[in-house]
A protein has these predicted regions:
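Metallocofactor- and cofactor-centric catalytic cores in central/energy metabolism, strongly enriched
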Residues: 112, 116-119, 126-127, 135-136, ...
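Catalytic cores of large soluble enzymes that bind and process phosphate-bearing ligands
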Residues: 20, 61, 118, 167, ...
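Short glycine/serine/threonine-rich phosphate/pyrophosphate-binding segments
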Residues: 91-93
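A hydrophobic, small-residue-rich beta->alpha segment in the mid-to-C-terminal subdomain
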Residues: 131-161
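Extended, intrinsically disordered, low-complexity segments
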Residues: 150-186
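Alpha/beta enzyme core
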Residues: 1-81, 96, 100-112, 123-127, ...
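Short acidic/histidine-rich active-site segments
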Residues: 84-89, 121, 137-144
Length: 186
């Protein structure tokens, strides 16, 4: 799975960038020819991590560029799968629930402020990528937040439970519901 361009944000402690550069269609043909990748994650405005923009601002993906890149790739190989890295949709209700649980568990305003500042990619933007031909949408940050919100809530409501399997069922159910919702929405 190749990534062409620079994707801003923080994927992990070793993979960070303050800026993004869009994938250049003129460089794409050479990249695909040189690498032979069959899965491509172009940079079109998505970002790694939970902060995909400023609070109150919507993320705007370059759907026109996505179509152009797919056209270039299809001239070389119709079997190349397009992937969206950093495409988490961060639902306000999940964030609000997590903030409530953090307030219950910790009294730190910094924790809740950080969660309240998270900005994701709106589903209509993701749907535009799917309609353009993207086949794989990476939503790791969204999955982590769904998992953590469910886990914090379960711990806060069941303080005497020490069996990890109890919590596994709750977090697995939360993730499953999130995945089902995505399938319904696509």
């Amino acid at each position: 799975e190749g990534e062409l361009g620079v994707l801003a944000g923080e994927e992990d402690e070793d993979t960070k960038s303050e800026f993004s550069t869009y994938t250049n269609p003129e460089e794409l043909e050479q990249f695909l020819t040189d690498t032979g990748v069959l899965m491509l994650a172009p940079t079109i405005g998505t970002m790694h991590g939970p902060n995909k923009g400023k609070p109150g601002q919507k993320v705007k993906l370059n759907i026109k560029l996505a179509h152009e890149l797919l056209g270039v790739a299809n001239k070389i190989n119709n079997d190349i799968v397009f992937v969206a890295h950093g495409a988490s949709t961060l639902y306000p209700e999940i964030i609000q629930y997590a903030v409530q649980q953090l307030k219950y568990h910790h009294k730190s305003e910094n924790d809740t402020k950080t969660w309240n500042d998270f900005v994701g990619t709106d589903w209509d933007q993701i749907k535009g990528l799917i309609e353009a031909g993207f086949c794989k949408i990476n939503t790791d940050t969204e999955n982590r937040q769904t998992y953590l919100a469910a886990l914090l809530g379960a711990i806060n409501k069941n303080k005497t439970k020490i069996d990890i399997r109890f919590y596994d069922k709750i977090t697995t159910n939360a993730l499953t519901q999130s995945y089902i919702q995505k399938l319904i929405m696509s």
